[in-house]
Every structure is written in C-alpha cells, then in structure tokens.
Amino acid sequence: MLNIGIFGAPGSGKGTQSELISEKYSLYPISTGEILRREIKDKTELGKIAEEYINQGQLLPDYLTIRILVDLFDKVDNNKGYIFDGFPRTISQAKALDDLLKEQNTSIAIVFSLSVDEKELIRRLLKRGKLFSRKDDNLETIQNRLTVYREQTESVQEYYRKKGKLMEIIGKNSVEEVFENIVEKIDNLFR
C-alpha cells in the first residue's frame, strides 16, 4: 500500500498535483478541503460548522477533521493506498493519521511540501477566485489563510522531516515540471 501526503500553502498547486498522483498510481484521493466544500454545499451539520471556520480563513478543529477521515476510512474499501491532499495540517492530525494507518498495517511513505513564494500564491488565489467564485479567495481571507498556514501547518513539515519522509518540491514551475519531479521522487522509493 502506497500512502502519500502532499501539502503546501493555499494556491501552491497541491490539489492539481494530488489529482495527477492519484491517477498515475491509482491512489484513493483524500482532500479534506473537497470533502468540506461538499458538506457545505449539501448543508449538512458538519458543513454548517465548517463554513463558519472557512469563511474566516481558519482551520477546522482537529477533532472535526479527524472525524471526517475516520468516517471516510470506514466507507472506503482500498488496498492500493491514499493520496492525502492538504492533510494533515497539525501535529495532532499527523499523529492521528499515523495511528489510523497503523490500524490498516501501513504508514505514510512520503510527504511532499510544495514551496511557492507568497506573492505568487496571492496572484494564483486571486485569479482562482475570479475563475471559480470561491468566497475564500478574496485578498483579506487569502492573507489570513496564509498566516494560519504558516502558524499551524508548517510544524507538520518538521514532524515528517524528523521521520525522514519529507520531500520539499519547488512549486513555482509548470504543472508538468512539478509533477515530473514528484514522480521521480516516488519512483526512487522503489529502486
């Protein structure tokens, strides 16, 4: 079973790369962001709670995010592995993910961190906001999301670095170049 994590600041391209990785390696994609947007659209109880946090540019509390993951693991019959898009975002979530995967006799093989400078992130997110009309892609919310990311998420890099599983990838290049770099790193795991 191959389990891969991919994270980076909002606008770093992790969703796009996650889709490409999922297709190439037949991994089940898990994007807590996508799950939450679906819950919000469907106006579920979880969706209403999540919407309040997202509209303020805040991360959901760990217990809610982990609940989403546990529910998903219970529903999905998967033996190839997972690609975790934007998860985990905190040390607590990383440890919970380790425990959940251990119950399935597997673990995270590699975690990619996409690095893009802040000006480029803001440019990408403002462009995306115009294209897709996402409420959370306005300048004030974007700046708050980037601050929250730096404060709460970057510690996860250190967690995986200490485990020898972190691979930093320059995310400013073309989608194709970034993907080629990622594929090379994954394939090197099996050589």
From Swiss-Prot:
Principal localisation: cytoplasm
An example molecular function term from Gene Ontology annotations: adenylate kinase activity
UniProt keyword annotations, A-Z: ATP-binding, Cytoplasm, Kinase, Nucleotide biosynthesis, Nucleotide-binding, Transferase
Alphabetized SUPFAM superfamilies for the sequence: P-loop containing nucleoside triphosphate hydrolases (SSF52540)
Pathway per the UniProt entry: Purine metabolism; AMP biosynthesis via salvage pathway; AMP from ADP: step 1/1
Compartments in which it is found: Cytoplasm
LID: region residues: 127-137
Region (NMP): 31-60
InterPro entries assigned to the protein according to its UniProt record, in alphabetical order: Adenylat/UMP-CMP_kin, Adenylat_kinase_CS, P-loop_NTPase
This enzyme's EC code(s): 2.7.4.3
List of residues binding ATP: G11, S12, G13, K14, G15, T16, R128, N173
A Pfam entry, by short name: ADK
GO biological process, one term: AMP salvage
GO cellular component, one term: cytoplasm
Family matches, as PANTHER family: NUCLEOTIDE KINASE
Subunit structure: Monomer.
Function according to Swiss-Prot or TrEMBL: Catalyzes the reversible transfer of the terminal phosphate group between ATP and AMP. Plays an important role in cellular energy homeostasis and in adenine nucleotide metabolism.
Domain remark in the UniProt entry: Consists of three domains, a large central CORE domain and two small peripheral domains, NMPbind and LID, which undergo movements during catalysis. The LID domain closes over the site of phosphoryl transfer upon ATP binding. Assembling and dissambling the active center during each catalytic cycle provides an effective means to prevent ATP hydrolysis.
UniProt record similarity statement: Belongs to the adenylate kinase family.
Annotated protein name in UniProt: Adenylate kinase
Organism of this sequence: Azobacteroides pseudotrichonymphae genomovar. CFP2
Gene encoding the protein: adk
